[in-house]
A protein has these predicted regions:
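Catalytic strand-loop-helix junctions within cyclic-nucleotide turnover domains
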Residues: 69-79, 111-130, 150-152
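A structural signal for short, well-ordered beta-strand segments
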Residues: 16, 66, 109-115, 186
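Cytosolic regulatory/linker segments at or just downstream of nucleotide-handling modules
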Residues: 118-120, 147-187
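Allosteric regulatory "coupling" segments in signal-transduction proteins
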Residues: 80, 128-134, 171-175
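Acidic/histidine metal-binding catalytic segments
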Residues: 62-63, 102-112, 152-159
Length: 187
């Protein structure tokens, strides 16, 4: 019953992952919508499976992108590492997918990962509700993803500090992200 649902949510510390299929808009100019949906679903399935294998929560699909988070609703001590493992699994699964697809359908993901506080809850109105994560940390993860090249995983300095002994990562030039007053250090 929509009248009984409470808007808003609860604050949580989460690791947010965004993965976007690079070049899909221009790719879309060449093919019929049915073919686009078929190809896009193959790529989004790869991303979704990688997130679920690491026990992440898929928030939503945003056109040619996926938004997911870790450490909620079930706490995970190793949530930053799980997000990075999911991103790496996406990249490996895409290599496999490319073996199944003609080269004209070879696309790649740009991935961004960040950690911080967010509110998880119902957003919208009684006619249309979404359960989602909202907060600066979520926006920052999105901005990091927007700066990742195809086939690239960018993690924030916060994530790097949490997993530095467990993964190999190199610093890249800090990014000046839209809406951010300070550059974001990424690896």
């Amino acid at each position: 019953n929509p009248d009984e649902l409470q808007m808003g949510g609860r604050r949580a510390q989460i690791t947010t992952l965004f993965a976007d299929v690079r070049g899909f808009t221009s790719f879309g100019e060449k093919y019929e919508p049915e073919q686009l949906v078929s190809i896009l679903n193959r790529y989004l399935s790869v991303a979704a499976n990688a997130v679920l294998e690491q026990e992440g929560t898929i928030d939503k699909f945003l056109g040619d992108a996926i938004m997911a988070w870790f450490n909620a609703p079930i706490p995970q001590q190793d949530h930053p590492l799980r997000a990075v493992k999911a991103a790496l699994a996406m990249m490996h699964a895409i290599d496999t997918l490319h073996g199944e697809l003609e080269s004209e359908f070879h696309l790649s993901f740009g991935v961004g990962i960040h950690y911080g506080a967010a509110v998880l809850g119902l957003i919208g109105n009684k006619m249309r509700l979404d359960y989602t994560a909202i907060g600066d940390s979520v926006t920052t993860a999105k901005r990091i993803q927007e700066n990742a090249a195809g086939g690239q995983i960018l993690i924030s300095n916060d994530i790097y500090q949490m997993i530095s002994g467990q993964v190999k990562a190199s610093p890249v030039e800090p990014i000046q992200a839209k809406g951010k007053s300070q550059p974001i250090r990424v690896y």
